[in-house]
UniProtKB/Swiss-Prot annotation:
GO biological process: protein retention in Golgi apparatus; regulation of TORC1 signaling; retrograde transport, endosome to Golgi
Organism: Saccharomyces cerevisiae (strain ATCC 204508 / S288c) (Baker's yeast)
Any one GO molecular-function label of the UniProt entry: phosphatidylinositol binding
Annotated stretches, region: Disordered: 27-59
Protein name listed in UniProt: Uncharacterized protein YKR078W
Additional observations: Present with 1270 molecules/cell in log phase SD medium.
InterPro entries: AH/BAR_dom_sf, PX_dom, PX_dom_sf, Vps5_C
GO CC aspect terms: cytoplasm; cytosol; endosome; vacuolar membrane
Source species, domain of life: Eukaryota
Pfam families: PX, Vps5
SMART domains to which the protein is assigned, alphabetical: PX
Amino acid sequence: MENDKASHASPSIGVNEFVVQGEISIDDSERSVKSVSVSISDDEDSKTDVQDNMATPSTRSKFQTDLAIDNRLLEKDPKYKKLFTEKRRRRRPESCINLMTKGKGTGQKDNINDQIFSLRILPGSDLNSLKDSLWIIKISTQPDVEKTIARAFSDFYWLYHQLQNNHWGKTIPPPTRSNILVEKDEFAINHLFMIRNNEKYDPIFNFKPEYIISLQLMAMIKHIFNDKVLRLDSNFIDFISWDDDLPESLQIVVDDSTFTGDKILMTSSQFRELKEFHKQSKKVESITNSHASLIPVTELTEIYISPTKLFSRKDYQRLFQPQSTDNTFNNNDPLIQEWIPKSKTLFTSLSFGSSAPTYQEASTEIQACHDWVSISKEQWKQLLYHVLQYIVDEAVKVNSVINEFTECLKQISLDEVIRANSELFLKFSKLNESFLKKFKGASRQDILKLIILFDENVRFCESFESILNQRLKLGKILSIIEVDLDKKKNFLDKLSPGNNNSNNEDLKIRTAEDEYRIVLKRYNRVKQSWEKIMEDILNERKEFEKREAAEVNSCLKSIRDLNMDEKKHYLQLWQDFVPDEHISQ
């Protein structure tokens, strides 16, 4: 593993400390934490998965007592009957949206599905350190109704990995790992333009890093909003600090207009809310055992399979809770070793040891997905670079022609052979200058639309690689359990034929049967997750291919229409210019 991963782990950390310390609280009294993202089954036979990150309340509270309710009291006053019989709901403070919509009748409720959400993300600090930078998120649903919160850049990565833990097989375009679109590498727009423009830098094409990063972050949040499963995730709702229920079908509009680059100062209330969110996110991460904040930002394809989600509650306790007074358990168990830090890191590695069985992907469809995503990722990178080359080359070419023509007109006007003609040439040069300015602005938007779309697809491929790694990891764990299951079955078969009906032999058989039954349930549970994630991966690929075709066509159509409008505008300037000159003469 890389050095930046190693920095997160202590060299002396034990396996029992790694799995048990702070990762999950078994005490029922400690479970009632807001926005718990994982529900661990209380029953060994239960196979319920995590659904929408709702915490499973304990069947009996520690301080619960049996209190008899006097029926006469209930009949005496309806208020008491309502208090003791109806389910109590948690009361949330009324948000600004509730205050605006309160008292408007049922007609407002009928239009909730047609609500349009506007999203805007602005820098809240300097980008000296991208990981520690602050960003202001503005979400508005109606005029004068706006929710403004502050989040650190690392919080977007926390959200990305937390949602990955909550929803195996779901792709989410991650935040940018660095200023990849503004650095001097093969994707550098500014550097590319400088080369095409004979090293002359034009400030109009100055793509500020904070602007490009804000577009990338907005693309990520927009994707989550558009996913009917992800947007209802309680961790995402906590991330955007939304108090009301999100509509089932909403429209999200991204405000991609340029900004001056001045940072927006946080208010004291936003700062307090940010600190509270960080505390809450740590609790959620500890309970769900997701390691969302521990995975390095440079590893977008790195994954961590939470054992608290994979196994049932009793099975998790059986595997990872210490069974002796020395606070240790069997470190040599191949299944336990899958969660032991490798190379002094806290992350499960896909480089498997020789003692564990080797997992080979049996599904031809998943193998095809591996080949497809590697080719698709490289193609999107190349397409991004070539499209940038073409757009920048064309922009520089037209820019140069118009500049030369304008300078020529200015030079002719300075000769003043005929004063009327000189004024005409001067006006015409100003006309071309105004058109050139609009042309540069339009070209800039063309570039931004394409690079954000293509870059989002590149990052989608990286997210797709991560869910393929989830499938690999689950397959590896399934192979280990399958070997253990065969051993338990063979041992049970050896005991059964030689049974002489003695008490000792009966005890051995019952013990072997219990162990076999436990491992069989574990195998079926993991296999169910392993098979389900394959269906999710195939569906994600189909959805992406359908979505990318529609988005690329829409983007190119928008650019084509914009260019047509610019040409019409330029012709209109010509048509208006000639009659005006005739009138002035």
